Amino acid sequence: MAVQQNKKSRSKRGMRRSHDALSTAQLSVDATSGELHRRHNVTADGYYRGQKVINK
């Protein structure tokens, strides 16, 4: 089992975690339906960049 050699300070722990924050999702409005969707993702009705890509 791994055991640390020395105790890491609160500062070192915070520095390591400084890149762990989540950013908010980027949203766009679909040109054809006006639906709000995540950027670079297909909308719920199957459109991507104004073209139908998924047939249900």
Swiss-Prot record:
<dbReference type="GO" id="GO:0006412">
    <property type="term" value="P:translation"/>
</dbReference>
<dbReference type="GO" id="GO:0015934">
    <property type="term" value="C:large ribosomal subunit"/>
</dbReference>
<dbReference type="GO" id="GO:0003735">
    <property type="term" value="F:structural constituent of ribosome"/>
</dbReference>
<keyword id="KW-0687">Ribonucleoprotein</keyword>
<keyword id="KW-0689">Ribosomal protein</keyword>
<comment type="similarity">
    <text>Belongs to the bacterial ribosomal protein bL32 family.</text>
</comment>
<feature type="region of interest" description="Disordered">
    <location>
        <begin position="1"/>
        <end position="37"/>
    </location>
</feature>
<feature type="compositionally biased region" description="Polar residues">
    <location>
        <begin position="21"/>
        <end position="31"/>
    </location>
</feature>
<dbReference type="Pfam" id="PF01783">
    <property type="entry name" value="Ribosomal_L32p"/>
</dbReference>
<dbReference type="InterPro" id="IPR011332">
    <property type="entry name" value="Ribosomal_zn-bd"/>
</dbReference>
<feature type="compositionally biased region" description="Basic residues">
    <location>
        <begin position="7"/>
        <end position="16"/>
    </location>
</feature>
<dbReference type="InterPro" id="IPR002677">
    <property type="entry name" value="Ribosomal_bL32"/>
</dbReference>
<dbReference type="InterPro" id="IPR044957">
    <property type="entry name" value="Ribosomal_bL32_bact"/>
</dbReference>
<protein>
    <recommendedName>
        <fullName>Large ribosomal subunit protein bL32</fullName>
    </recommendedName>
</protein>
